[in-house]
């Protein structure tokens, strides 16, 4: 375990008064205080002096929680931190640098909660071992298992899991189950704990789910009388990605899951479904048979093919509204035939609605919101993405709802400055997403008069009329800002001057996206690297995500400013690999806990945007990543400098 000596009054920490003072305190007192800290903070303390390091070593043998999601730890790091602890009850870890060899370290009988993300290099052995060892498990979340070439999962592994973990209450398997199970294998979930209340599956065929829920068994009293299966009967929250949402699967879910409160269904067909295998008005009539549903999301994604729910009309919305009078949130994506009449019926019938989302509402117009004041609605989240017929008038009507906190208008290309004038008067607004709208610098200046001080997230990606002027106006340093996330991607008129204004303002931005801004260059990186958000912290301390992909002015000079000590909290970096591949690779090796993307991938959202854009932004202030500093130390500078020298020689 590497440590860092602290210099105190010109001497080593081992000889300073600070450590001698700590020695006077009872170790039990120090350890009791340390039990309130997370793993990153404990590792930070361990690197300061021998006394604290000794206490941390003992605390790590009995701390109940080990949660590290912002850094992918290596096997060499995980082993000494986890191995001595036989009382660990909750493990949450990013496994991006781990594989099957770590199973014995991670899986232990004491665990009641396991959440492992990025398990690409694990096979089904991980799932099987959890079932064999973790008999008291209550929560299990596994992401991306066996996605690496050569890894696989077999049916037996899932059987071991469901047979062994008989107390599971939450189960989330976020990978494609259809790759490893045949449609007839759906009944394997009949082994699941009857205590299960939350089920989330990354991908499963609708046929498999339908067969699971509609299977019958013979009554013991009457061998000829079929009895409906009680599989998943206590599930309250169900979130599925299926190959095709259809009437059969909706009917099976509605009739079998009598305790259901939350239902999220998403599909992404590779071709237009046939009528017999698609969702229709009749299918919507089956939803919420038991009247308990509070949250509903039905989304057809165009990820693979431009498909929509072409067999659902306004009549289907009428059926849905009639069955969902008590619903609190609804998200409808891909209902291309539904008109104002259908959407308006939902709005006016569901008096408790607080979240309303429509994606690809091609027939939705301003008339839906014309008389919204006549309702008793108190909407906090509204998402109207890719509703091309909406104009400023609709937003003006929506803005009469002063409880709005999250407003997503991405892709509403007919929205202009008058909409922003209305939005500026929303006192609780925290998230504003305006990608692809027709707003100008003048429109954004209206925000200065109202919501600007409380706004946490702003996105103006692809708003072609914008220039540096709006940035200079908004970031003039005249007010304290709450803004954490800013997306300025694909603004072709944006220059380094805009980023200078941002850096000078000292805004505590944690997520900054500048992708495809052709006039942004090295000067912007230098300005951001030199930013001091707080007086007592190091330069550039607030940024956790920086996306510079396809910024035309970025050269190898920027990489000198992407090294430590600059950007100490940075976790995600988007860059164009062709700038200089050797330097990009050297940076990735120098900062192994920094996820460097060179192929234009969207950073940091993990696909959440596909489910419900009203909830895609989680606003938490980033804390300085002392864990990474402790793990990495000062090694690796020479390697990157060598790559730079070789580049200079070329």
Can you annotate each of these PLM segments?
Residues 1-24, 146, 612, 618-650:
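CRL adaptor-proximal regions
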Residues 1-308, 318-321, 329-331, 336-339, ...:
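N-terminal adaptor-interaction module of cullin-RING ubiquitin ligase components
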Residues 63, 88, 111, 137, ...:
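Conserved hydrophobic position(s) of the canonical leucine-rich repeat
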Residues 67, 92, 115, 141, ...:
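Conserved positional slot within leucine-rich repeat
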Residues 84, 107-108, 132-133, 164, ...:
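C-terminal capping segment of individual leucine-rich repeats
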Residues 99, 122, 148, 179, ...:
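Leucine-rich repeat
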Residues 222-225, 454-455, 481-483, 531-554, ...:
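Leucine-rich repeat domain C-terminal region
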Residues 377-395, 400-548:
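Eukaryotic tandem repeat interaction scaffolds
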């Amino acid at each position: 375990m590497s440590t860092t000596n602290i210099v105190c009054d010109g001497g080593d920490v081992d000889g300073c008064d600070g450590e001698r003072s700590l020695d006077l305190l009872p170790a039990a007192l120090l350890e009791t205080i340390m039990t309130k800290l997370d793993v990153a903070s404990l590792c930070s303390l361990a690197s300061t002096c021998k006394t604290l390091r000794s206490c941390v070593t003992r605390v790590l043998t009995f701390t109940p929680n080990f949660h590290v999601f912002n850094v992918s730890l290596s096997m060499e790091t995980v082993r000494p931190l986890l191995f001595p602890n036989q009382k660990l009850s909750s493990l949450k870890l990013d496994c991006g640098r781990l594989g099957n060899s770590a199973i014995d370290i991670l899986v232990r009988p004491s665990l009641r909660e396991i959440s492992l993300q990025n398990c690409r290099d694990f096979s089904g052995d991980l799932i099987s071992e959890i079932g064999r060892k973790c008999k008291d498990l209550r929560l299990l979340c596994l992401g991306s298992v066996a996605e690496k070439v050569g890894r696989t999962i077999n049916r037996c592994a899932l059987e071991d899991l469901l047979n062994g973990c008989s107390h599971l209450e939450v189960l989330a398997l976020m990978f494609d189950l259809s790759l490893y199970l045949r449609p007839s294998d759906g009944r394997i979930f009949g082994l699941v704990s009857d205590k299960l209340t939350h089920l989330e599956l990354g991908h499963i065929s609708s046929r498999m789910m339908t067969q699971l829920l509609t299977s019958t068994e013979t009554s013991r009293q009457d061998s000829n009388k079929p009895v409906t299966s009680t599989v998943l009967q206590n599930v309250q929250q169900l979130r599925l990605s299926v190959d095709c949402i259809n009437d059969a699967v909706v009917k099976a879910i509605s009739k079998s899951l009598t305790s259901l409160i939350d239902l999220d269904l998403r599909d992404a067909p590779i071709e237009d479904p046939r009528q017999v295998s698609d969702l229709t008005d009749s299918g919507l009539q089956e939803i919420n048979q038991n009247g308990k549903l509070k949250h509903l999301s039905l989304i057809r994604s165009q990820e693979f093919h431009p498909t929509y729910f072409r067999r659902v009309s306004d009549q289907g919305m009428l059926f849905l509204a009639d069955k969902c009078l008590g619903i609190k949130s609804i998200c409808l994506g891909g209902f291309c035939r539904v008109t104002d009449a259908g959407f308006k019926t939902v709005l006016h019938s569901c008096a408790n609605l607080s979240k309303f989302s429509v994606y690809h509402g091609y027939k939705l117009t301003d008339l839906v919101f014309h008389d919204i004041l006549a309702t008793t609605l108190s909407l906090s989240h509204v998402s109207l993405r890719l509703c091309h017929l909406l104009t400023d008038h609709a937003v003006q009507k929506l803005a009469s709802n002063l409880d709005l906190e999250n407003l997503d208008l991405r892709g509403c290309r007919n929205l202009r400055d008058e909409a922003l004038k209305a939005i500026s008067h929303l006192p609780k607004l925290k998230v504003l997403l305006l990608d692809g709208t027709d707003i100008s610098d003048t429109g954004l200046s209206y925000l200065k008069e109202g919501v600007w001080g409380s706004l946490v997230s702003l996105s103006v990606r692809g708003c072609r009329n914008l220039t540096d002027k709006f940035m200079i106006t908004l970031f003039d340093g005249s007010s304290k800002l709450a803004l954490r996330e800013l997306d300025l991607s694909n603004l072709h008129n944006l220059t380094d001057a805009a980023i200078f204004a941002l850096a000078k303002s000292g805004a505590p931005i944690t997520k900054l996206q500048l992708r495809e801004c052709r006039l942004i260059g090295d000067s912007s990186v230098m300005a951001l690297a030199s930013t001091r958000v707080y007086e007592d912290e190091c330069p550039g301390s607030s940024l956790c995500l920086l996306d510079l992909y396809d910024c035309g002015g970025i050269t190898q000079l920027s990489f000198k400013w992407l090294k430590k000590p600059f950007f100490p909290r940075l976790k995600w970096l988007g860059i164009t690999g062709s700038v200089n591949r050797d330097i990009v690779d050297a940076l990735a090796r120098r900062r192994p806990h920094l996820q460097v993307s060179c192929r234009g991938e969207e950073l940091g959202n993990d696909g959440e945007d596909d489910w419900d854009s009203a909830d895609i932004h989680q606003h938490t202030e980033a804390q300085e990543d002392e864990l990474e500093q402790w793990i990495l130390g000062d090694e690796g500078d020479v390697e990157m400098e060598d790559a730079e020298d070789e580049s200079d020689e070329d």
